Amino acid sequence: MHALAKWVPGDHLGLDIPADADALRDGGTAFLTEAFRRAGALGADNAVVNLELAEFRGGSTGRKAQLTVSYGKPCDLPGELFVKFSRDFDDPGRDLGRSQMALEVRFALLTRTPGFPIAVPRCLFADFHDGSGTGLLVTDRIQYGCNGIEPKYHKCTDHSMPDPLGHYRAVFTALACLAGTHKAGDRSGRDFSVDMRRLSVG
């Protein structure tokens, strides 16, 4: 993908996806409406009618943004959203890890399955273009520190957690639920083979 070509076709849902926040702004409510419909999150009789997008820096790869939207009709979709781009055109080091989102997108799409065994942020859209490593993920925004969700902890600061044992018990319990569901044959793991080279940032 040329640096100026900020839209690429998604491999899963067949919709052209924006590679960065500027392209998403250009796509505006029309893109979000079609994207949410294509992912099965938004009905054909509803639409995204307004959006506000604010980028922030976080994590080790790609770019992130907070997205606030409103809908034409009342619905159960969240309005406070999180956006993750696999690409970072301003930082080659962060852009190097762009292929990591391939499996993340597949997992996000899988979470839309009725009866998915663990609680995760609701996925409104996810797609990835393998040829360029360009991906887009739009989910419900986690409200840390409220409604039973732990506060946001910085990486590598487990010593500051009030209950690290309880934290990791919850993490491994969720992983066990996923593994058990997979082994029971209700979810396919064929799309989640591990390639450590693709998971490496540097």
Where are these regions (language model features)?
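Conserved NTP-binding catalytic cores of kinases and kinase-like/nucleotidyltransferase enzymes
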Residues: 1-134
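Active-site catalytic-loop/activation-segment of kinase and kinase-like phosphoryl-transfer enzymes
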Residues: 6-21, 27, 180-202
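Non-catalytic, well-ordered alpha-helical scaffold segments
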Residues: 62, 136, 169-173
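Short regulatory "switch" loops immediately downstream of catalytic or recognition motifs
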Residues: 69-72, 144, 183-186
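Short acidic/His/Gly/Ser-rich catalytic and metal-binding motifs that mark active-site loops
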Residues: 90-92, 146-151
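Short pocket-lining segment of the protein kinase catalytic domain that shapes the ATP-binding cleft
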Residues: 137-146
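Conserved kinase catalytic-core helix
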Residues: 149-193
